[in-house]
């Protein structure tokens, strides 16, 4: 199983059923950037965890639980396969607990995930982001991503940020 390397503040582990309460909290949290978004339920969190188990089995990656080195739950971050206009892409995605936002955790976790993707042969990485979600656009830019196009997805526009990746050995 692929797992990103720990960072100076964060660790990654597989998501499991025992994470249901934490995942419900992060997925159902009010998002001031998207106040009209339907808030997810505990049942949604169950399906989310089940989806990660399928991702781990099918792709050897998924969204991983992100914690501080002291074990405090930060959220999730990882890789998923996404169909964008009929083409499969690897996407970096994340959710951060409201009280943990604006502390650089999303960028730190997503950077480790980006580097893990590159080390495991992912050649192109995307992030699908709603136009009004400027904080996530900032994270994508911090990862070296650029706006590639806008697509219609799940009832609204989505910005497709992306970048080419290279293994570290190829950069030398």
Residue ranges, per PLM feature:
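Short, small/polar residue-rich loop motifs at catalytic or cofactor-binding pockets
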Residues: 60
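Acidic-and-aromatic substrate-binding clefts and catalytic sites of carbohydrate-active enzymes
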Residues: 41
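Extracellular/periplasmic catalytic domains that process cell-envelope and extracellular macromolecules
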Residues: 57
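Acyl-donor (CoA/ACP) binding surface of acyl/acetyltransferases
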Residues: 1-38, 46, 50, 54, ...
